Design a protein with these regions (language model features):
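Catalytic machinery of carbohydrate-active enzymes
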Residues: 1-200
Length: 200
């Protein structure tokens, strides 16, 4: 069995997009186990992604460098993983897999990470959408399809009937509509540019 550590993103939309990567990994490596290191608030999302074995809490806040703490976390993860995939582009996000001595460390070029990642991807322009970049990391370099040929599994969350009923009841109260009335929400925008917007 291949054990994979994902250094997850810190934003809800990015975390949802990362589910396409987890599905890709499970298709390519059916027996793999995927653990995701991410902020604590991500645990409820990750718990609803069936491909994720464990959601590990990243105790450091977004933007905190804290090299000694990153070393401690990395050391605690030694001898547990065969591959790490680093989704954020920051230099500091590549430290934990390095300190964990994970042999295959894959990610996109960013912030001088040349010596920290063993499988560095440099052709970001060929994959203009963030979800394409995430899914591309599920492939070895020599097997990587072009962006046009890249299959992107749709992200989804597993929910149970009780939760659906509770949500319908809550929406019915809040928006004064019948519980059996369909409700649809769309969030096509992005705060920081076109890479994360829905295609149009």
């Amino acid at each position: 069995m291949m054990n994979i550590l994902i250094i997850g993103p810190s934003w809800v939309g990015d975390m949802m997009m990362s589910h396409s990567l987890y599905q890709t990994l499970k298709t390519r490596y059916p027996d793999c186990a995927i653990d995701v290191l991410a902020p604590n608030w991500c645990k409820p999302l990750l718990a609803r992604m069936p491909e994720v074995r464990t959601a590990l809490t990243m105790p450091l806040g977004h933007g905190k460098f804290a090299l000694c703490e990153r070393y401690r976390i990395g050391k605690s993860l030694r001898n547990q993983y065969d591959m790490a995939i680093v989704l954020p582009n920051s230099l500091k996000s590549a430290f934990i897999p390095l300190f964990a001595r994970i042999p295959l460390r894959r990610g996109w070029k960013g912030e001088s990470r040349y010596f920290f990642l063993t499988d560095l991807r440099a052709n970001k322009r060929d994959y203009p959408m963030m979800v394409q970049r995430y899914v591309a990391l599920g492939y070895e370099k020599n097997a990587l399809p072009s962006a046009q040929d890249l299959f992107i599994p749709q992200p989804y969350l597993q929910v149970d009937r009780e939760q659906v009923a509770q949500t319908k009841e809550l929406f019915a109260l809040q928006f004064k509509q019948a519980e059996d009335h369909p409700a649809v929400g769309f969030c096509p925008g992005a705060e920081f540019g076109p890479a994360k917007r829905w295609p149009h």
